UniProtKB/Swiss-Prot annotation:
Its EC number is 3.5.2.3. This is Dihydroorotase. The lineage of its organism: Bacteria, Bacillati, Bacillota, Bacilli, Bacillales. Gene3D superfamilies: Metal-dependent hydrolases (3.20.20.140), Urease, subunit C, domain 1 (2.30.40.10). It is an enzyme of class 3 (hydrolase).
């Protein structure tokens, strides 16, 4: 099916929001201009809505295989489509881990059969993510690994991390890291700060993250490797990354919507839906994340979509697993709490969720360019809705944002020229 989207707005190559039509033919973007006419195309009048590149998320957890009670590739990618995401990168903390040919081939087969959006799987750095034996990077790259990570756990052995970075550099691949120094975690369930002290909980100190990042940055410099830091959460981490970039080290970084919108002061009680890793930090950390995003220290926004069951989250804040869902709330949360409040511009938000992650990892995505795959998201910037977890397409309903009123909701997502998800009657 060919589509002609009429009367929309988009961000042009100069970074300005302007009026446009957009023609999709044979699964690709055929033309982006005003006043397009075309035969043999279904005309969809978007009536002033934003026509954005499909959103790109480099940090997601789809749980399959092994964790299908939390999420499946089918439910997770449908939730991604509802959130406007057309390309997502799936972390390897599944069971089994994609750490060898057999496991990666099985994962790719599942993706091919079930995914509603483009899914790029990470390959594990170490076998079973155990930190002691390196995987066969060459084979995993051949089978389509997006990059290498042991996300969920930090690689504790510096010699292992250095060897991994050297091998990845030879393959022109990135090493991506969840950064925690295990000897400093302190069996924590929240940030070590006012909230942990008030509730008598073990806290995870900020330095647990920043010291690990500092170590890895020096290793990346020695290996001449692209090193990407997951979900930055502390002021110290931002400072270390900023200094590394100024020194010319190949380091990039991401931040989550929840760390941009919340800090520990916003946690109302010992509610497990506010438990994520890294935890919500202090006000100074939150301010540093915003500053880092604006000055280019932090390159992109990624959701760290981490679904869990209601039963798992009901165990209490100390025993419940870390993580919140992110796909279906990301854009409206960021638009309402950052753009509408003047913290960043709409143009910047689009870039942080599209071209910045795509360019960082060399993906042909994130821009509405003629000839590229038609991965597109239509967003109604005026529509206001209350976040209701019962309506999530993800199996995971674990969110701290239930009841929040937000504007800027995706209403249609197109992947490869096909409608992957559409809000009922949204464009009529």
């Amino acid at each position: 099916m060919n589509y002609l989207f009429k009367n929309g707005r988009y961000m042009n190559e100069e970074g300005k929001i302007v009026a446009t039509d957009l023609l999709v033919q044979d699964g690709k973007i055929a033309k982006v201009a005003e006043n397009i006419t075309a035969d043999n195309a279904e005309v969809i009048d978007v009536n002033g809505k934003l026509i954005a590149p499909g959103l790109v998320d480099v940090h997601v957890h789809l749980r399959e295989p092994g964790g299908e009670h939390k999420e499946t590739i089918e439910t997770g990618t449908l939730a991604a489509a509802k959130g406007g995401f057309t390309t997502i990168c799936a972390m390897p903390n599944t069971r089994p881990v994609p750490d060898c040919r057999e496991h990666m081939e099985d994962l790719q087969k599942r993706i091919e059969e079930k995914a509603h959006v483009n899914v790029l799987p990470y390959g594990a750095i170490t076998v079973r993510q155990a930190g002691s034996e390196m995987t066969d990077f060459e084979t995993l790259k051949e089978l389509g690994a997006f990059a290498f990570t042991d996300d969920g756990v930090g690689v504790q052995d510096a010699s292992m991390m250095l060897a991994a970075m050297k091998r990845a550099a030879k393959l022109d691949m990135a090493v991506v890291a969840h950064c925690e120094e295990n000897t400093l975690i302190n069996k924590g369930c929240v940030h070590e700060g006012k909230f942990s002290e008030k509730h008598g909980l073990n806290g995870i100190p900020s330095v647990c993250e920043s010291v690990h990042i500092a170590r890895d940055i020096l290793l990346a410099e020695a290996a001449d490797c692209h090193y990407h830091v997951c979900h930055v959460s502390t002021k110290g981490s931002v400072r270390v990354i900023r200094d590394a970039k100024r020194a010319g080290i190949k380091v990039t970084a991401e931040v989550t919507p929840h760390h941009l919108v919340l800090c520990e002061d916003d946690i109302p009680s010992a509610d497990p839906n506010f438990k994520m890793n890294p935890p919500l930090r202090g006000k100074e950390d939150h301010a540093a994340l915003i500053e880092g995003l604006l000055d280019g220290t932090i390159d992109m926004i990624a959701t760290d979509h981490a679904p869990h069951t209601a039963e798992e989250k009901a165990q209490g804040i100390e025993r419940a697993p870390f993580g919140i869902t992110g796909f279906e709330t990301a854009f409206p949360l960021l638009y309402t709490n950052l753009v509408k409040k003047g913290v960043i511009t709409l143009e910047q938000l689009i870039q942080f969720l599209t071209e910045k992650p795509a360019d960082t990892f060399g993906l042909e995505a994130g821009r509405l360019k003629e000839g590229r795959a038609a991965d597109i998201t239509i967003i109604d910037l005026e529509q206001e809705e209350e976040i209701d977890p019962t309506t999530f397409l993800s199996k995971g309903k674990n969110t701290p944002f239930a009841g929040w009123k937000c504007q800027g909701w995706p209403v249609m997502t197109i992947v490869g020229g096909k409608i992957a998800w559409q809000k009922e009657s949204a464009l009529v």
